[in-house]
Amino acid sequence: MQHDLRFIPFRSPADAGWDEAWSLYRDSFPPCERRSAEHHIRALADPAFTADGIWLGDRLAGLLFHWRGEGFRYAEHLAVAPALRGHNIGSRALEAYCRSSDGPVVLEIEPPIEGMALRRLHFYRRLGFVENPCHYIHPSYEEPF
């Protein structure tokens, strides 16, 4: 599955593929790790925010929601369609995103204690990311915090 991936930003929920991307977002992240539809629409209006659909041909393969900061980019959410997982789509997408960045790319994961969090840590390490030793607590996107 070596077809080129394309990043096409969603500008509004009326864009083609948005409903599928929103379902993938909701299914891929627990409520405390995602914003509500209302808050997400507000984020779409922020010029520092981009909600990219990751396309493989005419098929939505995944999503990458990210922010541009001064001198860096923050990759907030990356998800791959369940039927396409295990085909290096996430790796290829994140590598392409990092190559296109004009500064360092930062991201975060939940504490890598077990299961999926450890898998994510190893995934990001394989792509060249390193851990920041600082302790922090990421507040929930929605109440209650």
Show where each model-derived region lies.
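Short amphipathic alpha-helix that is part of the acyltransferase structural core
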Residues: 1-39
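A short helix-loop-beta-strand connector motif used in the catalytic cores of GNAT acetyltransferases and
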Residues: 43-53
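Conserved beta-strand in the GNAT
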Residues: 53, 58-68, 72-79
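A conserved beta-turn-beta hairpin within the catalytic core of GNAT-like acetyltransferases
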Residues: 67-76, 85, 103, 142
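Conserved acetyl-CoA-binding loop-helix of GNAT-fold acetyltransferases
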Residues: 80, 86-99
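Conserved GNAT acetyl-CoA-binding A-motif
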Residues: 100-115
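Conserved active-site alpha-helix within GNAT-family acetyltransferase domains
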Residues: 111-134, 138
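Short, intrinsically disordered, charge-balanced linker/junction segments flanking boundaries
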Residues: 139-145
